Each structure stands twice: as C-alpha cells, then as structure tokens.
Amino acid sequence: MDSDPPLVRDVFPDLIAELADLLMAEGERFLAISVLDVRLVGECGCADDFCRSIRTADHPPGQPYGPGHRMVPLLPQHGMLNLDVVNGRIMYIEILNRPR
C-alpha cells in the first residue's frame, strides 16, 4: 500500500498559516481553505539557492498546465509567494527569496 505524501502543513506549518492569511486577504477564500490540505509531492529541483518552491501535485516538469490554469500572486512581507492553480487545485507553491 502506497502512503500519501506528507501534508505541507505538517512540514511547514508557518508557511501554510501565512498562505491561508494572504489568500483570505486577496479574497481567495476557497484556496485559503484548500491550502490546509495540500501535500508535499516534491521540491522544485532547480538548485537555485533562492528557490524553496514545492510541488503539491504530480505534473510533468516543463509542461504547461493547460486550460484552467491561473497564477495567484501573493504579497508576503518577505520574498515572493505565488501559486499555480488548475481548476481550483493548488498544483505548485512558488517560494522565492525567502529565509530558510
């Protein structure tokens, strides 16, 4: 039996709390609720020292998300946080220029 990847909230609780607050501030109530249940599928893998981005769903690297995709930019106090969302599902959390 395969086990599910860990919940991001269990690995990075402060990040998820911040994302939920920022999403509510942007009027993204559905995403603010759903971010609590995203899974840590994998790291970005780009090896850039300023990138801490994570994949929250399976998706072939380098392929476009296609129809239903939107990018949700957020306004954190430090660095950059953006979400790739497809048909309401958070696929990727872009985390750039943030302290470790």
Q: Would you name each region that the model predicts?
A:
Residues G66-R100:
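Short, compact, well-ordered microdomains
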Residues M1-H69:
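N-terminal domain-onset segments
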